[in-house]
Amino acid sequence: MSSTPGSSLSADFSEREQQIFHRTRLLVGDQVLHRIGDLRVILFGVGGVGSWCAESLVRSGVRRLTLVDSDRVSITNVNRQMPATVPTVGRVKVEVVRERLLAINPDAEIRAVQDIYCAENAESFALDTYDVIIDAIDSLAEKAHLILRATQTSALFVSSMGAALKMDPTRVQIAEFWKVGGCPLARALRNKFKRAKTRPKRK
């Protein structure tokens, strides 16, 4: 693998992208970078968790990303959300995030959908067409519905639980849903599934 920033990676990557991801390429190699670049990713929620997730994805080489969120930027978002600054207050979050991501990689395909995921419109998102589904929704009913649907697909599925009012980042862990502890949101979701006598498919 060449260490020259402009050396050919693939016809799929623009010359600019080859320069942007040069250091990532040195770290993970051509094959992994191609896999990352080919992923079709959909992210639900671009608030305090999802907005930073979106930026990390694009900086890591994800080039096809759909953003879904119905909210507009509020002044109270400024302390913790990537799209929130005083000048962006009142603007549609997914549009602000899209602009930010295209400033990072102008050649990326970033789709912004100003909508809320819910049972009534769930079918419109065609989850089976994505390789990765990320849940950063903070409303219980919509989150539960997305978990049930996403776990029925072949996609890699990641769901963010709750970290509100928590101060120790060293205690954040990645765990199987039924094993998550110390999280009121995860507990509420498990109780909701038990009451409904349904369970997400294990991934």
Spans of model-derived segments:
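N-terminal charged helix/coil linker that caps or initiates catalytic domains
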Residues: M1-I42
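Alpha-helix C-terminal capping/helix-to-coil transition sites in glycosyltransferase folds
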Residues: D38, L127-T129
